[in-house]
Amino acid sequence: MSQDLQKEVASRKTFAIISHPDAGKTTITEQLLLFGGVIRSAGTVKGKKSGKFATSDWMEIEKQRGISVTSSVMQFDYNGSRINILDTPGHSDFSEDTYRTLMAVDSAVMVIDAAKGIEAQTLKLFKVCRMRGIPIFTFINKMDRQGKMPLELLAELEEVLGIESYPMNWPIGMGKELAGLYDRYHRVIEQYRSEEDERFLPLGEDGDLKEAHAIQKLLYYDQALEEIMLLDEAGNDFSRERIIAGEQTPVFFGSALTNFGVETFLRTFVDFAPSPSSHESNEGVIEADNPKFSGFIFKIQANMNPAHRDRIAFIRICSGEFERGMNVTLTRTGKSMKLANSTQFMADDRETVNRAVAGDIIGLYDTGNYQIGDTITNGSKKLEFEKLPQFTPELFMRVYAKNVMKQKHFHKGVEQLVQEGAIQLFKTWRTEEYIIGAVGQLQFEVFEHRMRGEYNSEIRMEPIGKKIARWVKEEDADEKLSTARSMLVKDRFDQPLFLFENEFAINWFNDKNPDIELTSLL
């Protein structure tokens, strides 16, 4: 790989933004896009009545509900770095999509609501990041409102998540009393709602302001200095190595809604965030600077442009250089393909991409060739990156087309939405009626909404009373083993499994059939 290409790869910063719903994830994404010069003004998820919606919330149902249910991909340049942001679903029902997205990034930004602290979804996603060793940067949001005390939030972060923290800045006041941020890293105080020439006040070697200022008369100023002194004496030492190893999280305070502390966060993040790193494969570790092009598909999205009914496969480039028109091998099938139609994104806006390098996320127009987890490369034809996680559904519905004359629309919609991986498809053993599985109720609502809006197919869904899926070997697939509490079905790959009513039904099945092994996904 040439030095120029190595430099280009090193400039890539590819990260996901994770949070519990309503922590302000989409708002901070908007502000980052603002600093990247991509948008002129930030939309707001809360501004539904005005008809303004967030740039990253592009799907119709997201605009209606004010939640992210798909992973948007956005790219911009900032301070010499190429930023690739993946805005992940904030709703817990879409954890599968989020987990797959976390396989495609080099770091994560965790957004926490200052009033609520660590919430269930945050904890879940954090654990996945830790499992993968992904560096985590923490942004404690909504400091313009009353919330938990900063020291309490730090203690919660360390106790609940089990990770060292290092506050890069520290709030002076909170809510209506918010006056500024004491920036430990840049050695300045960033004032809240100040004139531009007074926004940053330099600190002296003693930790106080170099020159006298009105902010020093505030009660909260002295309190902040005392807390900073406590952090200096008893807190963790700053360690870039531990940050990169995912063992220490730099913590930033701010307010995404009022755009306070966000640009400082972005500037610091670009300095620290890791460049594209290596990926595990069946042929060993593939380094980002390997000259051979390789990548994997972590997401498939249908109807990003409803007028064209198209489908896009999102690929994370792991090594080498992509050039439009290049020939690659889809290693799952061994098929040679020409990558002529490629695109990059700003939520639903897109432009043709002629060239990209390791760390970039690009979209490939898909006519049905790709599956989530596929590896493509112009190197070894047997290369396969590690498998992406798939989850066992916990809710199941039988699904029918209301209008039998529109079966074609129905089948196409089900097929495409299942290939996206947002919902799983099963079929009854003999009659092959459709059963869809999900990890949460919202997935069914989104599925029904998209079937109607994107495929002109009204559907009827009926619960089947089964909650647990367990796969069996083909030789154990005997319909006679089905009971009122268990049902033999097959998945989209025709693999047999039983759907059980509850744990009691599984135990009963195991007692009656001790030689049959039941297995689950994640």
UniProtKB/Swiss-Prot annotation:
GO cellular component, one term: cytosol
Start and end residues of each tr-type G domain: 10-277
CDD domains, A to Z: RF3, RF3_II, RF3_III
An individual GO BP term: regulation of translational termination
One Pfam family recorded for the sequence: EF-G_D2
Database matches in InterPro entries: EF-G-like_DII, EFG_III/V, G_TR_CS, P-loop_NTPase, PrfC, RF3_C, RF3_dom_3_sf, RF3_GTP-bd
Keyword set, alphabetical order: Cytoplasm, GTP-binding, Nucleotide-binding, Protein biosynthesis
Keyword Transcription regulation found: no
Binding site for GTP: 19-26, 87-91, 141-144
Domain of life of the source: Bacteria
Entry's Gene Ontology molecular function annotations: GTP binding; GTPase activity; translation release factor activity, codon nonspecific; translation release factor activity, codon specific
Keyword Cytoplasm: yes
Cell compartments where the protein resides: Cytoplasm
Family assignment from sequence similarity: Belongs to the TRAFAC class translation factor GTPase superfamily. Classic translation factor GTPase family. PrfC subfamily.
NCBIfam families listed in its UniProt record: prfC, PRK00741.1, small_GTP
Function summary: Increases the formation of ribosomal termination complexes and stimulates activities of RF-1 and RF-2. It binds guanine nucleotides and has strong preference for UGA stop codons. It may interact directly with the ribosome. The stimulation of RF-1 and RF-2 is significantly reduced by GTP and GDP, but not by GMP.
Protein name stated in the entry: Peptide chain release factor 3
Gene for this chain: prfC
